[in-house]
Amino acid sequence: MKKESQVIFDRNVVEFVTVAAEFCKFLEQAETMKRDTFVDTLLKILPLLYLKAAMLPETEIIGDDAPESYVTEETYEVLRINLAGILAEKDDYLDVFIQDMVYSDQPIKKNISEDLADIYQAIKDFIFVFQLGLNETMNDSLAICQEQFKEYWGQTLVNTLRALHDVKYRQSEEDEPEDDDFEDEGESDCHGHDHGHCDCEKDLNYGY
């Protein structure tokens, strides 16, 4: 007699499946997206995905056979290349919180696109099996996805989130005019002449 899992009907599982499916769909359709939109959306989806994964009930494998895999090497590589194209020069980042740091005292260069493809692979394999609707394999795919979350893709998600945060907000800082430098120059120009006739404020273009 086959074992039946009740865990797969848990509310937290249903919510995780919903967010996970949206995450996969977003990455699959992101090829022509502008980088700003892509980064902004991921900064909202990834924390939610982590939260829903962390709230999953403990699940144990009940079947004898491993669930099918959906993501092939080709699928993975096509997605990674598409994401790298969106991020362009912002794809690389330095990471210090990975296992390889045990053997090195220098930060390791990572790629946001590769991290996202790694997360996608684990999530998509789970979603593919779960949507087939077979109780035992649904349960086992959930158990595997949960274990992979604990072992690697949860940490990968957090690392990627930090890198994406840097892309969004450091880029914003770089785009802002360096007012301090202008002010310093302005102050030096004022020295030695009548401030009543100084046009320094007029020279500083604040946009109004």
What kind of region is each of these model predictions?
Residues P107, A122-Y208:
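Acidic, proline/glycine-rich low-complexity IDRs
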Residues K2, V7-E73:
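N-terminal interaction modules that seed assembly of large macromolecular complexes
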Residues E4, I8-R11, P67, V71, ...:
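Conserved aromatic-histidine-acidic binding/catalytic patches
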Residues M33, M55-I62, E89-V96, V129-E136, ...:
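Intrinsically disordered or highly flexible coil/loop and linker segments, enriched in small
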Residues E58-I127:
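Long amphipathic alpha-helical segments
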Residues R11, E15-E22, T41-L48, K52, ...:
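Charged, amphipathic alpha-helical oligomerization/scaffolding segments
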Residues K2-K3, K25, K34, K44, ...:
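Context-gated lysine
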Residues M1-V7, D203-Y208:
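Short, Lys/Arg-enriched, disordered terminal segments
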